[in-house]
Amino acid sequence: PPVIAGQGTIGVEIAEACMERDLTPDQMICCTGGGGLLAGTSIALRHHFNALEIIGAEPEGFDDFARSIEAGERVSNASGARSICDAIVTPTPGKITFAVNQALVSHGVAVSDDEVLDAMAFAWAQFKIVAEPGGAVALAAALSGKVDITDRKTVIVVSGGNVDHSIFEQALKRL
């Protein structure tokens, strides 16, 4: 719970920024591994925007959250999958975080490593943001069309800048 509360401050900051601009978001996309960032951010945003659609984003091969939401219970990933999104590759959603997210999140989507690299390149080219792979999955979900953002006010959480030099170089070569 302290981790969820701490990560919820991101949601508080987003809510404050939206309210200052008289903006009501339609949906929020956030990366998820164990589920703490998604849970904390979702609690805070849902407090202010009760109609907000909340979507979790994960790397392909590590879509345990999306499958757990569909199954109505925690499920695990098969062993052997690989991803550049090392910060969020978890075997199973956390017990406490899954309970929170199950109540607040509508669904999850999975993105490929190539889509993540494209999102990292986009974040750099458009905003000069150095995003680590796991922190770029929500942006990848939007850019790839796996989450429809057309005519929808969408909050996209991009977090973390701990990226290996060679992976960031791979992303920048896509520009």
Where do the language-model regions lie?
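PLP-dependent amino-acid enzyme catalytic core
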Residues: P1-L175
